[in-house]
């Protein structure tokens, strides 16, 4: 396929409104299709309702209520939360504190429900704290520190003091380095390569008039012990 692809990963100003402004700029520039990773699902859904019906749209993330989206591509957020809980249980943790940002989106909320339900089944005490990643806070001793957003996971790793009590979400280069160094005990991940590849194929297929089904990606738990072994290394480092 001969496709002109442009990546826009940073926004000026407040990220939620700025993403909607960037989306509007794309369709006003007569872009044929977009792949979106939602920052603020409610705002983005409202923006998409104004988009021309000819715009092919694929969303990497949870469903946007009321938006006309050709295809959603995402792991199951609740299952990802359960997998993270299983890692906490397997490590013998008896209590945990879950850190959610004030702007936590729908995916983080669903991960939280999956996590807490599984932990309560095993009678593991779970406290929830609302705090933004850039705020000044310290991790409590003797409890697992859990994040359900990549930015918050990074914030916990920065405050971990080298312990292995942080459990989080994401597979950025920095987070994988923190995992290898022992600043994180486990990370719930999906294949970002698959997400990107399938989202582009979906937009192309929509432009060719093909109806697309939503795609559910597998999610996994990466640890320092398995991150360089097959198949986890293929998931985390698909191009190497």
Each language-model region and where it sits:
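Hydrophobic alpha-helical segments within soluble ligand-binding/sensing domains
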Residues: 72-97, 171-175, 190-208
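Flexible loop/hinge segments that line or gate small-molecule binding clefts
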Residues: 41-79, 172-181, 185
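Hydrophobic alpha-helical
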Residues: 23, 33-53, 115, 129-178
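Hinge/cleft segment of the Venus flytrap/periplasmic-binding protein
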Residues: 119, 194-240
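Short, high-confidence coil segments that cap the C-terminus of an alpha-helix
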Residues: 31, 93-94, 141-143, 184
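Short beta-strand elements in bilobed, periplasmic/extracellular small-molecule ligand-binding domains
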Residues: 1-14, 97-100, 116-137, 144
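Exported/periplasmic ABC-transporter solute-binding proteins
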Residues: 150, 158-193, 201, 209-218
